[in-house]
Amino acid sequence: MKLSHFLTGLLLLLVFLSISIGTSDFSWEKFFAFDQQTWLLFQESRLPRTISILLAASSMSMAGLLMQTITQNQFAAPSTVGTTEAAKLGMVLSLFVFPSASLTQKMLFAFGSSILFTLFFLAFMTIFSVKERWMLPLIGIIYSGIIGSVTEVIAYRFNLVQSMTAWTQGSFSMIQTHQYEWLFLGLIILIAVWKLSQTFTIMNLGKETSESLGISYSLLEKLALFLVALTTSVTMITVGGLPFLGVIVPNLIRKRYGDNLSQTKLMVALVGANLVLACDILSRVLIRPYELSVSLLLGIIGSLVFILLLWRGGRKDAV
């Protein structure tokens, strides 16, 4: 049996569990009997939450894959080049400018901030010709820390700490109807990678080789940055941060299937969705009836895998 078939079956099982498990009892028997309360719970809470997990997880995993492709660095991802922290900064600035900022205003500020600071980071890495692959995440973590510190200072100075924490903590517990629709913008990056997978794969060969093969490298690089910034922004304003997801999932898949996006795109989306769904289900049952933050579980798993990847990458560069 193909791994993709197994992952698809596992995903369906996790979707079933995600809809079934929660603080409120959900009965499939009542669901198929068209019980009004059960259907209300399904439509207003369980279904939106499950859909938001699938969209956020698959799109953020794909954003990591795309970031690694355009930088030719396996450790690049929204969380390691400052994109995630920049989106958080944009959200805080939106709350400062508009105390009762709408989701649209938060989205625009987060998007503008994330694309601006990501461009600055990539320009810095290019100007100083940082060649070692393992240096990118280290510099990126420092860079993210600086942005995060500025964000904290602004939030503290203008009494926005509580609002910032509530909006940026990775959790799906508050997802309901009319609160997750922005995540459908994540479909843009999924469709783009699906349609342009061969073109993005050629970008792995570098700028000179890509342009010699007729690829408009600069245009596609800007498109990729736009897609990554958009995906990171809508995820941040809707569910908060999903740490290390964009790093570990593409790396695990590329080690098995190589750098051809035509072969990795589906697997990256499936593994990302399965991982976040599993973490979300665990977050509901570990201290039931209370919930843990999904970002906490993802952070524990992701940090361990990331350290292992970083250690192996450093050893290869040393050799």
Each language-model region and where it sits:
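Alpha-helical transmembrane segments in inner-membrane proteins
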Residues: 1-319
